[in-house]
């Protein structure tokens, strides 16, 4: 499987090893912590390398099978990068606000997406037959929907995998994915809870340099995996049956010719 290299040097340079202050830690992250320095927990990067490779392999496997990934982070430091990553790799994203039921109440969310697209279509026309006040009101509604749903506007069904940066902020996303048994890959800082995360990646979830590195690794993995999307094998049982029938007909025909 072809995934990008992950090594301790690049993680160090991006500040991935820097956790939160020791007072803010989650004891469940203890096994991922190397030690502390100046009252800040230091993440064990040897484990980060191992877990990151495992996660990237899972992402590669998902995409190469034609699966789609939902990339989630509504925090300021990651918002722009998450949007860019998803657009460059043809995946989906949520980077403004996670709406309750975004996964577990998918039918209702789809109706909201339809409403958003209808407003986009209406407001793109020169003469839409509404007053200025109505146009202004609809414009605000459209913008509100676009902020929350623009990244999943073309998502026809639930994603096969979710990638999250900061599970504390995105606790609703974690809970909904867990309920629906959707695998979660997540960056876990020293104040995170790894309990419901299938593929944890211990690392700094606040520094822009760290977030940029995560997104770059994810981007390269997805782009590479897209080249190997599995084509559904042709069911040759019908073809074999057809050939058998043709062979049988040929034999009968030859027999009839001999008897004439």
Language model features with spans:
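Ribosome large-subunit tunnel/peptidyl-transferase-proximal elements
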Residues: 2-233
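Intrinsically disordered, compositionally biased charged tails
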Residues: 1-9, 223-260
């Amino acid at each position: 499987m072809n995934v990008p290299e992950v090594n301790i040097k690049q993680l160090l340079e991006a500040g991935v090893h820097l956790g939160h202050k020791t007072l803010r830690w989650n004891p469940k992250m203890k096994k991922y912590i190397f030690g502390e320095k100046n009252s800040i927990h230091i993440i064990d990067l040897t484990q980060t390398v191992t877990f990151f490779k495992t996660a990237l392999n899972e992402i590669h496997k998902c995409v190469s099978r034609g699966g789609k990934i939902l990339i989630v982070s509504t925090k300021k430091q990651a918002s722009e990068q998450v949007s860019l990553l998803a657009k460059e790799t043809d995946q989906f994203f949520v980077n403004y606000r996670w709406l309750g039921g975004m996964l577990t109440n998918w039918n209702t969310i789809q109706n909201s997406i339809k409403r958003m697209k209808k407003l986009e279509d209406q407001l793109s026309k020169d003469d839409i037959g509404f007053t200025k006040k109505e146009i202004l009101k609809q414009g605000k509604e459209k913008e509100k929907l676009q902020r929350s749903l623009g990244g999943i506007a073309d998502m026809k069904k639930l994603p096969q995998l979710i990638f999250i940066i900061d599970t504390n902020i995105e606790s609703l996303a974690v809970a909904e994915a867990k309920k629906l048994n959707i695998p979660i890959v997540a960056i876990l800082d020293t104040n995170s809870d790894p309990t419901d995360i299938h593929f944890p990646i211990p690392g700094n979830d606040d520094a822009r340099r760290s977030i940029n590195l995560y997104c770059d690794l994810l981007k390269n993995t997805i782009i590479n995996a897209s080249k190997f999307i599995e084509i559904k094998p042709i069911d040759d049982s019908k073809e074999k049956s057809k050939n058998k029938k043709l062979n049988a007909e040929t034999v009968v025909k030859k027999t009839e010719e001999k008897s004439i």
